[in-house]
Amino acid sequence: MKIVVIGGGAAGMMFSTQYKKANPEDEVILFEKSSYVAWAGCPTPYFIADELKKSDVLHGTPEDFIKRGINVKIHHEVTKIDFENKTLTVKGNEINGIISYDKLVIAVGAKSFVPNIAGYSQNLENVFTLSHAEHAFKIKDFLNENKPKLKNAVVVGAGFIGLEMAESFRKNGLNVTLIE
C-alpha cells in the first residue's frame, strides 16, 4: 500500500513514524514544503527566549526519518489533490508532476490568521507570524541581530503561543503589548 502524507510537522511525522512501524511493508512518502520536519510548535517561544536549544524543538532531520523507511521529500509542495483518481500534483526539487496514492493523510498544521490591517505586508521586516519552524528562526535571528535597538513588541493573539511569545519578548528585555 502507498501512503502519502502532506505536512512534515509534529502530526505528519508522528503519523508516518507510527504507521511505518506498524506496517513496515507499506510505502510511506511525506511531502514538506519547507526545510524542516518534526517541528514541535508548542515550545517555540522558549526556543526564541534561548531557554531551549534547536534540538529541543526539532525532533529529527529528514535523513533520520529516511533511515526509518519514510520517504521524506522536503522542498516539495502539493499543489493539487484529485480525490476521485487518488492522485496529487507535486512541485519540488526531486518530483514535479502527478503521483498516485492509496491512502492520503493531510497534516499541514495551522496557518496564522492575519487581520486586515492597512499598510500590512508580509514583506515588512519587523512583522512576523508564527506557525512554523522557519518563522521561529526568523524571529530569533531578528531579535539577535537587532537586540540593542529593539524596545517594544506587539503580540496579536492571546492564546497559549501568544502569551508565551509575550513572555519570551519580556525575557528579551522588550516592553510588550498584547492584543486579543
Sequence positions of predicted segments:
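Beta1-alpha1 glycine-rich phosphate/pyrophosphate-binding loop at the start
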Residues: 1-71, 168-180
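Glycine-rich Rossmann-fold phosphate-binding loop(s) that bind the pyrophosphate
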Residues: 7-10, 131-132, 157-159
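Short, mixed-charge, low-aromatic patches
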Residues: 17-23, 37-38, 91-98, 153-159
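Conserved acidic functional residues
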Residues: 82, 164, 180
